Amino acid sequence: MAPPGHLLFLFLLPVAASQTNEGSCSGCGPLSLPLLAGLVAADAVMSLLIVGVVFVCMRLHSRPAQEDGRVYINMPGRG
């Protein structure tokens, strides 16, 4: 469950968003198409990298132990 501080932040976020003016972004310009394409491509590469690392880590983690052939009395399915 989320800590109470996070819930308070979520409740106050719309209030803070309503306090900002539409033109309050000084010096902000439109993003160029190559920059936007680069950001999307970088996001896709990072997402695939994270998925790959998680897949490799879970695959290594799920390998059975070398002593998996032992018989355990109180563990059904292992004997």
Swiss-Prot record:
Transmembrane adapter protein which associates with KLRK1 to form an activation receptor KLRK1-HCST in lymphoid and myeloid cells; this receptor plays a major role in triggering cytotoxicity against target cells expressing cell surface ligands such as MHC class I chain-related MICA and MICB, and UL16-binding proteins (ULBPs); these ligands are up-regulated by stress conditions and pathological state such as viral infection and tumor transformation. Functions as a docking site for PI3-kinase PIK3R1 and GRB2. Belongs to the DAP10 family. It comes from Rattus norvegicus. This is Hematopoietic cell signal transducer. InterPro entries: HCST. GO terms for molecular function: phosphatidylinositol 3-kinase binding; protein-macromolecule adaptor activity; signaling receptor binding. Residues 1-18 form the signal peptide. The chain crosses the membrane at residues 36-56. It holds the Pfam family DAP10. It is a single-pass type I membrane protein. Keywords: Disulfide bond, Glycoprotein, Membrane, Phosphoprotein, Signal, Transmembrane, Transmembrane helix.
